[in-house]
Amino acid sequence: MKLLNNLAIKKLISVVVLFIALFFLGYDYYQTSQPNIWGDEPDESYITISGKKPIDAYLEVWTHFWVTGDECEAYSYDLFGQKAHQGGKISQKITHDFAKDGSNFEFRIPYQTYKNSQNCIVELRDFSIQAHNDFDTVGFAQLRFSPAGREYYNREVDLNSLITADNCNSDIFKSIRKEWAGAIGCHFYVDGKKKTKDEEFNAYTIYYDFSKFNNDTVIHYDILAGENYRSEPLSSAQKTAVVSDDN
């Protein structure tokens, strides 16, 4: 009887130990499998871009970095797989939205220059943000950010300015596949001053002095729907019916 009790205790201890081991293995896997979200750690420097958006829209940010330096060990390659030149460009897509509700957005963007593990200087070149919904899956209200210059077209915009993609409305056009497709165009404003003559279906560019970026920098950008803003996509029947009628 005593032997059976000892065996039962040992079996129970083994089960408990196994459960604890599996718990920590699972926790470790969970931690390592989580996406690397920039800006969720206190030692990560970033600028913020935030504002309003249509509740059905989702946004994404693209950042592009120069990779340079005399000691840089990374190379760009040509179509034949041969080394073309030292350094190159890194592109990063950011999709994590820190906003707490669907009518706003908040993205955190790395901006500081640093030296990577290949002794290359990595420096922010430009970045952009654009919206998508089920009607316009290609993207709309795209805003690009580039370094300011001395020409009339790339003059510096104040970092505290409010940028607005206003009166964003849907339009239908014939695609290269001879089907009708949807797109959304917007009018762009900076501090209430209209910057685009017609609806912009491509992108608008803002020029900043990147050297002024710091951890407190917040870019204010609102995307506002117009009366003819559309969320629902064209159905297959609608596309073919319209094309048939046009022919």
Curated annotation (Swiss-Prot):
<keyword id="KW-0472">Membrane</keyword>
<keyword id="KW-1133">Transmembrane helix</keyword>
<comment type="function">
    <text>Immunity protein that plays a role in preventing early activation of toxin TseL.</text>
</comment>
<keyword id="KW-0812">Transmembrane</keyword>
<dbReference type="GO" id="GO:0016020">
    <property type="term" value="C:membrane"/>
</dbReference>
<feature type="transmembrane region" description="Helical">
    <location>
        <begin position="7"/>
        <end position="27"/>
    </location>
</feature>
<protein>
    <recommendedName>
        <fullName>Immunity protein TsiV1</fullName>
    </recommendedName>
</protein>
